[in-house]
Amino acid sequence: MGTVSSRRSWWPLPLLLLLLLGPAGARAQEDEDGDYEELVLALRSEEDGLAEAPEHGTTATFHRCAKDPWRLPGTYVVVLKEETHLSQSERTARRLQAQAARRGYLTKILHVFHGLLPGFLVKMSGDLLELALKLPHVDYIEEDSSVFAQSIPWNLERITPPRYRADEYQPPDGGSLVEVYLLDTSIQSDHREIEGRVMVTDFENVPEEDGTRFHRQASKCDSHGTHLAGVVSGRDAGVAKGASMRSLRVLNCQGKGTVSGTLIGLEFIRKSQLVQPVGPLVVLLPLAGGYSRVLNAACQRLARAGVVLVTAAGNFRDDACLYSPASAPEVITVGATNAQDQPVTLGTLGTNFGRCVDLFAPGEDIIGASSDCSTCFVSQSGTSQAAAHVAGIAAMMLSAEPELTLAELRQRLIHFSAKDVINEAWFPEDQRVLTPNLVAALPPSTHGAGWQLFCRTVWSAHSGPTRMATAVARCAPDEELLSCSSFSRSGKRRGEHMEAQGGKLVCRAHNAFGGEGVYAIARCCLLPQANCSVHTAPPAEAGMGTRVHCHQQGHVLTGCSSHWEVEDLGTHKPPVLRPRGQPNQCVGHREASIHASCCHAPGLECKVKEHGIPAPQEQVTVACEEGWTLTGCSALPGTSHVLGAYGIDNTCVVRSRDVSTTGRTSEEALAAVAICCRSRHLVQASQELQ
């Protein structure tokens, strides 16, 4: 896909002024953009009033889309440092214009951001990037790029719990207290499915269509937006039939928009929220572009303001982490499945996958409102449709419990999903362990879920292959990191540990010499009023295993991890299991440092479960019983034969290398260690409600 066709050529300023002096040139410029001549004169008049920015070097960086066909060179988002005020943003923009004019270049400020993030959108020559990066307050600059719509009645039955399944879809809550913002094409608001439920705002920021010099009217191309509005809240085919919606037009008739247009749309939502605070807000982003630091940052700001953002994973049959806003950690990212709960295939492409996907939802042959007429319906497919389902489910959950935080909502979506129903063989082999096997579903009840201890598994990005490379996994701000583990496909790793970073604990994993890289795996939980700490025991004396326990009164063990400096711990037979009667203890190899995660919270109780098997098995699992939640997952022994340990739902999985490549003997054993916790106070509260 090419760049937007309206991009202008850039002329040196003296030549441009000569052209403006001539009658023909003046008329042409006036037709093209009437305010350019006034801008040139204004810049010349204030040129002497603005001093040059100091050029003592800069820490500002430049970013652009990795997908070359999606780039829009000539338009740039200049992001300023977080504490920059609006007046400083405006002065920085004027300074850029004045200094560019001194060098013979014309620039145009298209938008000044404030309220969501500080910065401005500028149209200028790429020759000015070095100058712009040295301006005061600049944090980074990102070249604009394109984003695209992600669309190419079984679906309502699929997301409904069995106890509610009947001849009609009748969810326990319609989402009437929630407002959903849709950033898409426009919407045919008089369609009988959504009439009276959707307000079409006056917001519009779309690029010209490829091969044209004009915008078609929104009413001529509102199929995608109309369909998604119907999926979210349609009278007959909608998920949250009581939710109200507002639409912002950020995609043109070809389903194409820009990162900058999406940013301005998100800023519009934030300003609306500040001017007229309402109840819970859900923002549906059924679009995808290349990875964008600035778009992810804007999503983060809006999420931290209390807005729930749901986005399409993308339809490129690729790692969702390569796309935005799908890669933003604060966004709920949704992949697409079909009626058989299998990943959606769209020609040679299909749903995206990987660690940045939170869950999947129905996204193939979804019946919804059509813009062809006010009573027409049409079938569409894609991760846009899947995201619309989750936006509807989120609206119903928030309507039932308006005080839910983003972290609480995400944990509930994961907890109540259908598990282990997707055929993982569809995904690339290296993505199978990273991709969640979850299909969205409504909870059996939208009330009473608060008594459960919710946890999820968060994978880091893959580290580099160098010996000292590390990977870091982080929990959301409202979550507690209760345990840390690591995984390497080659088995060449040096373990993991928890450390404080920016006032929060993070999980750091270490690659080993000759390794191909490592993943850090965090177990992130909702644990109100928790007080957690990490206790470490250094490598033990020869002939002894290393042990560490929770020594603070009232603290219980929630996770164990180990880290070693040697390249190969060798074998350890049999695995060192903890002595009976000492549950609050982590044990490990004598040459490793052992770390115990210890937490105190009202009514928190935990227990350890172990399951060991002899070689040659390459995987061992152990699960927590119903009513208990997996908080920790680790392996014994922690040797280089073990690929790593990770949690899937409530099960601890430990994998080892192929026996034929390790030289292991049948005398050696492999054990999975699960730590299972629950809150007695929450359980008692639930029993009282019943």
Curated annotation (Swiss-Prot):
Disulfide bonds listed in the record: 221-253, 321-356, 455-525, 475-524, 484-507, 532-599, 550-598, 560-586, 606-677, 624-676, 633-652
Domain Inhibitor I9: 75-147
Family: Belongs to the peptidase S8 family.
Top-level enzyme category: hydrolase
Modified residues (Sulfotyrosine): 36
GO terms, molecular function: apolipoprotein binding; low-density lipoprotein particle binding; serine-type endopeptidase activity; very-low-density lipoprotein particle binding
Location within or outside the cell: Cytoplasm; Secreted; Endosome; Lysosome
Cofactor(s) of this protein: Ca(2+)
Stretches assigned to the Peptidase S8 domain: 153-459
Taxonomic source organism: Gorilla gorilla gorilla
Main localization (coarse): cytoplasm
Region (C-terminal domain), start-end ranges: 448-690
Pfam families given in the database record: Inhibitor_I9, PCSK9_C1, PCSK9_C2, PCSK9_C3, Peptidase_S8
Position of the signal peptide: 1-28
An annotated GO BP: regulation of neuron apoptotic process
Residues bearing carbohydrate: 531
Domain remarks in the Swiss-Prot or TrEMBL record: The C-terminal domain (CRD) is essential for the LDLR-binding and degrading activities.
Chain's role: Crucial player in the regulation of plasma cholesterol homeostasis. Binds to low-density lipid receptor family members: low density lipoprotein receptor (LDLR), very low density lipoprotein receptor (VLDLR), apolipoprotein E receptor (LRP1/APOER) and apolipoprotein receptor 2 (LRP8/APOER2), and promotes their degradation in intracellular acidic compartments. Acts via a non-proteolytic mechanism to enhance the degradation of the hepatic LDLR through a clathrin LDLRAP1/ARH-mediated pathway.
Name of the protein in question: Proprotein convertase subtilisin/kexin type 9
Subunit structure as annotated in this protein's UniProt entry: Monomer. Can self-associate to form dimers and higher multimers which may have increased LDLR degrading activity. The precursor protein but not the mature protein may form multimers. Interacts with APOB, VLDLR, LRP8/APOER2 and BACE1. The full-length immature form (pro-PCSK9) interacts with SCNN1A, SCNN1B and SCNN1G. The pro-PCSK9 form (via C-terminal domain) interacts with LDLR. Interacts (via the C-terminal domain) with ANXA2 (via repeat Annexin 1); the interaction inhibits the degradation of LDLR.
Catalytic site: 184, 224, 384
UniProt xrefs under PANTHER family: PEPTIDASE S8, PROPROTEIN CONVERTASE SUBTILISIN_KEXIN TYPE 9
Residue(s) carrying Phosphoserine: 45, 686
